[in-house]
């Protein structure tokens, strides 16, 4: 089972390896605005993998396949990794690590406030998922799940807002997260 989990984590890191190779000039490139490409790619893959993580709960519940129960935490941590890379790309590359500029930019730009809030939610879950906190994590699983859903909603809102135009891709993410949230609510009410 551990090898399967490792394989899935490696597969989910392929976009990051691809982006890294392009950044190093091994093949292709990052286009006319490489910083924007890196920020966008890490953010979008963080959102996609977060959605996959959320998809696992209804999959386990409705299919009753225990095999999938091992994947939410490692895949969720990969989503956090991409989100962290998204923030660090913005903070260290785009803003040159200047804390004052970053704070002013976040305060003055509404979609950055929303993105920052989503990042903080995932940061909390990432820290809480450490082995030492496992008993607390397991006891508060439903709260953690709510925080992850909040992060997903904030992430898709951040993406939609920063796009400044209506994009089909953003609509797909909104619809997917809405359906997953409804499934989750149905599962939660069915258990009570």
What kind of region is each of these model predictions?
Residues 1-192:
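Membrane-embedded alpha-helical bundles that constitute the cytochrome b-like, heme-associated redox core
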């Amino acid at each position: 089972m551990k090898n399967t989990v490792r394989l899935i984590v490696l597969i989910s890191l392929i976009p990051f390896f691809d982006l890294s190779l392009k950044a190093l000039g091994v093949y292709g490139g990052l286009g006319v605005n490489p910083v924007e490409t890196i920020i966008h790619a890490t953010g979008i893959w963080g959102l996609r993998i977060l959605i996959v993580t959320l998809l696992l709960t209804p999959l386990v519940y409705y299919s009753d396949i225990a095999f999938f129960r091992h994947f939410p935490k490692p895949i969720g941590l990969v989503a956090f990794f991409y989100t962290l890379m998204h923030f660090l790309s913005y903070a260290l590359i785009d803003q040159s690590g200047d804390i004052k500029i970053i704070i002013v930019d976040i305060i003055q730009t509404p979609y950055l406030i929303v993105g920052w809030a989503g990042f903080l939610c995932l940061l909390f879950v990432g820290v809480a998922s450490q082995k030492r906190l496992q008993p607390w994590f397991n006891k508060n699983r439903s709260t953690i799940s709510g925080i992850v859903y909040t992060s997903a909603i904030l992430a898709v809102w951040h993406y939609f807002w920063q796009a400044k135009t209506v994009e089909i891709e953003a609509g797909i993410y909104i619809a997917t997260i809405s359906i997953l949230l409804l499934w989750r609510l149905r599962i939660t009410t069915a258990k009570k």
